């Protein structure tokens, strides 16, 4: 990617922490916790880790009409069974805010009259607790191993990425909470972020804090995503007051 963009070999810009007091970020919640609680501001305590995987089933492509059920190696069916097993097993190890998602399923060749010889799913889960993340991964590995051993299709798991949960700076959280109480008394809460954000990256170099404003209907990553103008204005007020408090020391 760097080569295509013409940046290969160039030194990367680095933040000089000594030059900055820290980093503040405002964002829509992208969920419904604030709205369902009747609150207007969320002070982010931590940002979730996202662990992503590819799960691949290898079966045998064949005719959908002439291949007897007893001898089929239907990769699509094997995938669906694993997806159902994940949805049964994960609640046993999940926390209150753990989430998991099958984001994409691909069947090859993807024709209505052909038994899929290969099936692939992209799967992820999210949490802020490193120990729970490890337990979720073990559960996933066990289910994939069970599916592979049960046959008739082969199943393998590929880890794609594992981000690290990040705590927001305590002083910044306090400043945001005090500002929220000033501008929206009693209408705020501390909460983790279930989505990744810039603050998660910047927090590796400088103190970071983050606030949320409500998402209407808890909708995000969709054309209907929206936030009330009054809540956006309130978020700006809280952000400015918190920044002034932090800079005043």
Regions found by a protein language model. Give the residues of each.
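Midchain, well-structured core segments that form catalytic/ion-binding scaffolds
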Residues: 1-131
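Predominant activation on well-ordered alpha-helical scaffold segments within soluble catalytic domains
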Residues: 3, 52-54, 76-87, 141, ...
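Glycine/charged-rich beta-loop-alpha catalytic/anionic-binding loops adjacent to active sites
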Residues: 58-64, 183, 219-223
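Alpha-helix N-cap and loop-to-helix initiation/capping positions
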Residues: 71-74, 135, 171, 227-231
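Short secondary-structure junctions
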Residues: 90-99, 147-154, 182-187
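A short beta-alpha structural unit
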Residues: 101-110, 122-128, 154-173, 193-194, ...
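Short amphipathic alpha-helices in soluble, non-transmembrane regions
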Residues: 135-145
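Zn-dependent metallopeptidase/amidohydrolase metal-coordination segment
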Residues: 188-238
């Amino acid at each position: 990617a760097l080569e295509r963009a013409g940046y290969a070999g160039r030194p990367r810009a680095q933040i000089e922490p000594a030059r900055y007091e820290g980093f503040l970020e405002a964002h829509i919640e992208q969920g419904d916790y604030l709205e369902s609680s009747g609150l207007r501001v969320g002070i982010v305590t931590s940002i979730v880790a996202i662990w992503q995987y590819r799960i691949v089933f290898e079966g045998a492509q064949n005719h959908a009409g002439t291949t007897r059920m007893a001898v089929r190696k239907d990769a699509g069916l094997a995938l669906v069974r694993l997806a159902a097993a994940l949805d049964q097993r994960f609640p046993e190890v999940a926390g209150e805010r753990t989430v998991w998602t099958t984001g994409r399923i691909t069947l090859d060749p993807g024709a209505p009259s052909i038994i899929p010889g290969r099936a692939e799913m992209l799967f992820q889960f999210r949490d802020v607790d490193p120990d729970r993340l490890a337990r979720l991964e073990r559960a996933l590995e066990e289910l994939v191993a069970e599916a592979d051993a049960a046959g008739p299709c082969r199943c393998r798991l590929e880890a794609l990425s594992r981000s690290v949960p990040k705590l927001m700076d305590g002083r910044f959280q306090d400043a945001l909470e005090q500002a929220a109480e000033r501008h929206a008394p009693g209408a705020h809460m501390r909460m983790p972020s279930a989505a990744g954000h810039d603050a998660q990256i910047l927090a590796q170099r400088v103190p970071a804090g983050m606030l949320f404003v409500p998402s209407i209907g808890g909708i995000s990553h969709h054309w209907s995503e929206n936030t009330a103008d009054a809540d956006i204005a309130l978020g700006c007020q809280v952000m400015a007051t918190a920044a002034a408090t932090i800079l005043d020391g």
